Each structure stands twice: as structure tokens, then as C-alpha cells.
Design a protein with these regions (language model features):
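Conserved nucleotide-sugar phosphate-binding/catalytic loop shared by glycosyltransferases and other
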Residues: 4-5, 9-11, 32, 36-87
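Structural motif
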Residues: 6, 110-111, 178
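A short, glycine/small-residue-rich beta-strand->loop->alpha-helix junction that serves as a flexible
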Residues: 11-23
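Short internal beta-strands
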Residues: 37-43, 139, 179-184
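An aromatic- and histidine-rich active-site surface loop
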Residues: 46-49, 112-130
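Conserved nucleotide-sugar donor-binding subdomain of glycosyltransferases
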Residues: 74-120
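Active-site proximal beta-strand in glycosyltransferases
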Residues: 128-146
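A nucleotide-sugar donor-handling region in carbohydrate enzymes
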Residues: 147, 155-233
Length: 233
């Protein structure tokens, strides 16, 4: 099988957790396939560690909308209402899809990787964006839960879960695209997604490939517990 040489890597979602594992994935890609060329698309603050690592950021990254802003607006204390975040970020998602469409229409890539880039996955499944090369989506959870008894929130959660399951079916039923789940099957609740919707874990096992945990360090370095504890004082 021919190894893809030019990869567009879109580090999505919020905060720095995703880009940390994305850099770990990029390191392993280069280790196994030294000829790989990575071009990155991300927004602040994910652009900071990417620049520090010397990665190639596309110029369009300066215009890529920041998902962290609507996330902060949806947060209360130490928690965040995911549904409220999803509703607040629609404008940013539409903007990012427009930029993504411009990039793939001009750039020649062999594969596109998206780390929780829901806006791209949905737009591809709805054929709002045409992508001729394979698309790889990375998840670390599946399905939303309502955090209150508000019927509007419950309906919104159900609608989002329906869209998510439908997107997976459309995007992942063939041999072209792939979804990776950063974790184990047990990390997906063995519960229903909603009325007439699939069981979460069964759905994940059907459509996702589980990678185990992606770590930005080598666990073997910490195998000697006594030495590790002594170094920590």
C-alpha cells in the first residue's frame, strides 16, 4: 500500500489537550514514515505548541476561528454544557468549513486528519464539502448527555446525538474514511444514545478503531517506580 506523503492535519476542539496528542501522533508518523509532510490547520491556543515544535502551520491558521471562546461562554465554574457550546459555536464552525473548503480546493493532499473536527465531519457527510482523498477523524468520547431536566436541552441533546450517529454512518460505512477512538471500548458507556438510536458502545465498535491511550511520553521511562518517586523528592 502506498504511504500518503502529504497530510493536512486539522487540530480541532478546544484547549491544549488535543494538540498535545496530535503532536505525539505526528512524531510517530514521522518515525515510521520519514517522508511524510505535515501541514497544520489550527486556531489559538493550539497554534502555540505547534509553533514551538517547529511544525508547518498553513497561513489560513491565522483566520481559523477559535473554538475556545464559545466554550468559555458556555462554561460555568468547573463544568461546561456541551450542548450550549455546540449551539454557540455554529458561526465559528461555518467559518472554519469555508476555510477548509478553500484549502483543499487549492492544496494537494493525500489524506486529511481531523482531531474532533465535528464541523468538517458533518459538512463532509452532508456533501457541503467534497473531499477526494481519505478523511481520518479522531474521537475521545461519543454521545452527549443532558445535564438538566430542561426539555429543550433534552431535545437538543437527542438531536445532536442523532446527527452524530448519522454522520458516522454516512462518513464511515465505506472503505475510504476512518475514525480512530483515543481510548478503549470500555471508555464508551454501554448505554443507549436515545430513542430509536443505537447503543453507544455497539456503535463505537462498529464504526471506530480503538487506538488505546495516546500519550505524549514513553511510559517505559516511568516503569521504575522507586526511581521515579526519588526524583520527585
Amino acid at each position: 500500500m502506498e504511504v500518503p506523503k502529504k497530510i493536512l492535519y486539522v487540530s480541532g476542539s478546544i484547549g491544549l489537550g488535543h494538540v498535545t496528542r496530535d503532536l505525539a501522533i505526528a512524531g510517530q508518523l514521522r518515525k515510521q514514515y520519514p517522508e511524510v509532510e505535515l501541514s497544520w490547520l489550527a486556531s489559538h491556543p493550539a497554534t502555540i505548541p505547534l509553533k514551538e515544535a517547529g511544525e508547518k502551520l498553513l497561513p489560513q491558521a491565522d483566520m481559523y476561528a477559535n473554538d475556545s471562546v464559545p466554550a468559555e461562554n458556555a462554561a460555568r465554574g468547573f463544568g461546561m454544557n456541551i450542548l450550549k457550546y455546540a449551539s454557540k459555536t455554529r458561526r465559528e464552525w461555518a467559518h472554519n468549513v469555508k476555510i477548509f473548503r478553500q484549502i483543499i480546493s487549492k492544496g494537494k493532499f493525500d489524506v486529511v486528519i481531523g482531531d474532533e473536527t465535528y464541523e468538517i465531519g458533518i459538512s463532509l457527510s452532508m456533501k457541503l464539502v467534497r473531499l477526494k482523498v481519505p478523511f481520518v477523524m479522531i474521537y475521545d468520547f461519543f454521545g452527549l448527555d443532558s445535564v438538566t431536566e430542561n426539555p429543550i436541552e433534552k431535545l437538543g441533546v437527542y438531536t445532536w446525538n442523532w446527527i452524530w450517529a448519522k454522520t458516522d454512518r454516512k462518513l464511515l460505512s465505506g472503505q475510504k474514511n476512518l475514525a480512530l477512538f483515543a481510548g478503549e471500548p470500555e471508555d464508551v458507556p454501554d448505554t443507549g444514545l436515545g430513542f430509536f438510536l443505537p447503543n453507544r458502545r455497539d456503535h463505537a465498535k462498529t464504526y471506530y478503531k480503538f487506538t488505546g491511550y495516546i500519550l505524549p511520553f514513553d511510559p517505559a521511562q516511568y516503569a521504575d517506580k522507586t526511581r521515579f518517586m526519588s526524583q520527585g523528592g
